[in-house]
Design a protein with these regions (language model features):
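A structural detector for beta-sheet-dominated domains
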Residues: 4-5, 33, 54-56
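...with weaker cross-activation on analogous glycine-rich loops/strands in unrelated enzymes
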Residues: 128-196
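N-terminal capping segments
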Residues: 38-145, 169, 186
């Protein structure tokens, strides 16, 4: 069972604190303990309209153990990995818009590379956690556009489907499509200067913005893009 929503918590369980209100986040996978539709008692509660999953935990002696838990069928989950399409990438990305940015997982939130990693993990695609490692993917997947002019980059990106990955040193984002000739991206952003402004803002949000926003050095994100990563 794959979590395809941004996050949710399991129901409170008065008999098993290790799974009570446990938070599950996008891309997490849990094995099914029983076939979907199975009805049985789990710690005194019948499993109607729930998936029964195995949650890995640590036993008192330090060994691995699994605890059965119930996941309501109303939660945003998928049996098995989602089919990989770029439309599905955008659908998943949209579920994170407006959430707080958290560098390295601070504030129980995502930074730019964690966001991209978790979205793609829903398809069974395991990307590197760090931006620097992501940029080192083989040429088969990562096209180097660092030597192109700004307009050539714009045309190259315009030819790509929304959902591909764009990156430059220190930041990674998902191409979100275009509004006319304006390129848009979705990312967990820390800071940038808005279009037609030189003043850097503390953004700290997952949002859709123009690739014409600027870094502190004055470069636009479009000018800074070095790699286009396309899977499939």
């Amino acid at each position: 069972l794959v979590v395809t929503g941004s996050s949710f918590r399991l129901c409170r369980d008065p008999y098993e604190p290790l799974v009570s209100e446990l938070e599950l986040t996008m891309g997490m996978r849990l094995s099914l303990a029983e076939k979907p539709g199975t009805v049985k008692s789990v710690r005194g509660r019948m499993s109607y309209d729930n998936y029964i999953v195995n949650v890995p935990s640590r036993a008192a002696d330090g060994s691995l153990k699994f605890i059965e838990a119930l996941v309501p069928i109303s939660r945003d989950v998928h049996i098995g990995y989602m089919p990989f399409t770029y439309s599905n990438v955008i659908r998943l990305a949209d579920k994170t818009r407006g959430e707080i940015y958290g560098w390295g997982g601070m504030l129980d939130a995502r930074d730019c590379s964690a966001l991209v990693m978790e979205i793609y993990r829903c398809f069974g695609i395991m990307l590197p956690r760090n931006t620097s490692d992501l940029a080192k993917l083989p040429e088969k997947y990562a096209a180097d556009v660092s030597s192109l002019s700004t307009e050539a980059k714009r045309e190259t990106i315009l030819s790509q489907p929304a959902g591909v990955i764009l990156c430059f040193p220190g930041h990674v984002m998902i191409y979100y499509g275009s509004d006319g000739n304006e390129l848009l991206c979705l990312s967990a952003a820390g800071k940038f200067a808005p279009v037609q402004s030189s003043a850097t803002q503390n953004v700290y949000t997952v949002e859709v913005c123009s690739l014409d926003v600027r870094l502190s050095n004055g470069k636009t994100w479009l000018e800074a893009v070095e790699k286009i990563i396309r899977i499939g």
